[in-house]
């Protein structure tokens, strides 16, 4: 097997948010094993350093970016810092998210609402603003935004989270439409479905996690969506069904 086949992302730079645990951590490691240099974004320096050790063991390198995604100006500065150091960005994984309050909408506190919108939706919009020019400089820019099946279900008490993910999906689809014919950038969404993560355990405390797919299984699908050979854009990869789906508006 050639090195290109074994490490198809060699020489590429990938930014992953929420990189210190769950799907984000597994994705960062999968991309590293495929040869990418990882720009790992997370809130906790200690957890980022642990990830760095794991990436080195995987045979790759990382740049650690401690950042609270509610820090809008910090996100705005991120793109410039990446450009100065690397000149471009090849892959963006918008994974970081919070569950928010599992509360009737009429009882959600404004700060809880604002925090969920800030992390799950506004941060990704600011990341688009910050990273879009860098991704367009790549010969095969790829962006994957991690969504949720909650975006399609009007389920009691899930309103805050569902609204943020529905907004994220339209953000991603609009971005994909805007760049489709003017650059090599491809933008897609992924629904991981029920996965063995801390967030899932918080939402379903009585569930047996051993019955759920692991973050590593989901990460393998995200990796495929980041390869230059993956050319779909504006689509949703539904991990539970292993299907790539086009969005169908109401008649």
Where do the model's predicted regions map?
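C-terminal helical subdomain
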Residues: 185, 189-190, 197, 205-251
């Amino acid at each position: 097997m050639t090195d290109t086949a074994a490490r198809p992302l060699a020489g590429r730079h990938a930014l992953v948010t929420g990189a210190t645990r769950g799907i984000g951590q597994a994705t960062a490691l999968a991309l590293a094993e495929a040869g990418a240099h990882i720009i790992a974004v997370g809130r906790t320096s200690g957890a980022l350093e642990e990830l760095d050790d794991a990436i080195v063991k995987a045979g790759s390198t990382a740049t650690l970016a401690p950042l609270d995604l509610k820090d809008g100006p910090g996100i705005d500065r991120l793109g410039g810092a990446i450009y100065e150091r690397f000149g471009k960005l090849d892959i963006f994984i918008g994974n970081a998210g919070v569950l928010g309050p599992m509360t009737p909408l009429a009882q959600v506190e404004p700060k809880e609402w604002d925090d969920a919108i800030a992390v799950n939706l506004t941060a990704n919009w600011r990341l688009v603003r910050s990273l879009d020019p860098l991704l367009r400089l790549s010969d095969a820019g790829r962006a994957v935004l991690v969504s949720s099946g909650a975006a399609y279900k009007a389920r009691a008490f899930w309103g805050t989270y569902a609204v943020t993910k529905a907004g994220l999906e339209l953000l991603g689809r609009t971005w994909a439409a805007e760049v489709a014919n003017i650059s090599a950038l491809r933008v897609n969404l992924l629904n991981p479905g029920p996965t063995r993560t801390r967030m899932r355990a918080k939402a379903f405390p009585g569930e047996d996690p051993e019955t759920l797919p692991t973050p590593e299984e989901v990460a393998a699908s995200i990796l495929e969506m980041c390869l230059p050979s993956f050319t779909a854009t504006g689509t949703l990869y539904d991990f539970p069904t292993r299907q790539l789906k086009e969005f169908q508006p109401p008649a």
